[in-house]
Regions:
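Sec-dependent signal peptide recognition
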Residues: 1-4
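C-terminal motif of bacterial Sec signal peptides marking the signal peptidase cleavage site
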Residues: 9-12
Length: 231
């Protein structure tokens, strides 16, 4: 009996404790099953020690740990600590992959090749970010390519959320060695459709939870922009 007890003590002492990510996330808190598909947290690390975390639920960027001007590692995007918080708050959009069409489509209607399509209305009579079940609310298939990249794929079927055409999607998140998060979007379709993919991360470069961004200055290097109307 004593030998058995000693073995149990030895096993408990040598049992490896789960390590948190740099941002304090536990990978086990993202292991679940949603919509009949497995979810997980994928951790990307570059040669400088920076880190980005992505979950395949909604293809969401959960955290980005990069050094500030003093070299202190800081999480600069908003995100939840576990998968259940994302599932319970799907339309907060934190870090989500947005599609089939980012932003609003007025009155949820558009015409293509002489056919008018009606989309679900989820924002004051308009269709926002592909509707209430956009790509930020689905489980993507995921494959970690290497330490710095994860590849997400999803088939958006013809008629999903009212959009025409089967759309095969591949999105690759890469944490580069200059501490940038590179997001590459690829999509192919079998019939004319509309596509406008983006990411919906909320940035706070101060890294202080609960702080505002009113002292941030933003500059966008763009040659053109699309003006908006009252809708």
């Amino acid at each position: 009996c004593m030998a058995v007890m000693a073995m149990c003590v030895l096993l408990s002492c040598t049992e490896k404790k789960e390590e948190a990510t740099l941002s304090g996330l536990m990978k086990s808190n993202f292991v679940s099953e949603v919509q009949g598909k497995p979810t997980a947290l994928y951790v990307l690390k570059n040669q400088n020690g920076a880190e980005a975390c992505v979950t395949n639920w909604g293809g969401r960027l959960v955290s980005v740990m990069v050094p500030d001007k003093d070299g202190k590692m800081t999480d600069v995007v908003l995100g939840y600590d576990n998968i259940q918080q994302y599932v319970d708050n799907p339309n907060n959009n934190y870090g989500g992959l947005i599609g089939r069409y980012g932003n609003r489509i007025a009155n949820g209607k558009f015409s293509l090749d002489g056919v008018e399509y009606q989309l679900p209305l989820n924002n004051n009579g308009h269709c926002l970010h592909g509707g209430p079940e956009g790509y930020h609310t689905v489980v993507w298939d995921a494959k970690q390519v290497n330490d710095q990249s994860v590849e997400l794929t999803y088939l958006s079927k013809d008629g999903e959320a009212g959009f025409p055409g089967n759309l095969n999607l591949k999105v690759t998140y890469t944490l580069t060695n200059d501490n940038a998060v590179d997001i590459k979007y690829e999509a192919t379709t079998d019939k004319p459709t509309v596509v406008n993919l983006t990411n919906h991360s909320y940035f706070n470069l101060s890294g202080v939870p609960g702080s505002q961004i009113l002292d941030h200055t933003l500059m966008i290097a763009a040659d053109t922009y699309v003006p908006v109307d009252a809708t």
